[in-house]
């Protein structure tokens, strides 16, 4: 009996590479606009305020702020609460002398 099957045959299929899906930024974390929040197949999480959805259902931040997770109408929703701009003291006008 041959222990090799012969030409053009394969022992077994090969495993596919992992796609690194899942939540990338968690609740309470500060994010900048454009950062990826969730990589997913299908809409396990839905975009809330301040969040956009890409063609592959990736959720990303539209504004800078803190990430929040919640539910709306029975759906899991990811939102970004915009950060309050830090109050900067007024700079005195520079004098020439």
Swiss-Prot record:
Q: Name one GO biological process term.
A: translation
Q: Which UniProt keywords apply?
A: Ribonucleoprotein, Ribosomal protein
Look up the record and report any one GO term of the cellular component aspect: cytosolic large ribosomal subunit
Question: Which InterPro entries is this protein grouped with?
Answer: Ribosomal_bL27, Ribosomal_bL27_CS
Please give the PROSITE patterns that the UniProt record associates with this protein: RIBOSOMAL_L27
MF annotations from Gene Ontology: structural constituent of ribosome
Sequence segments annotated as region (Disordered): 1-23
**Domain of life assignment:** Bacteria
The record's similarity note reads: Belongs to the bacterial ribosomal protein bL27 family.
Output the PANTHER family linked to this UniProt entry: LARGE RIBOSOMAL SUBUNIT PROTEIN BL27M, RIBOSOMAL PROTEIN L27
The record, for HAMAP family, names: Ribosomal_bL27
Protein's UniProt name: Large ribosomal subunit protein bL27
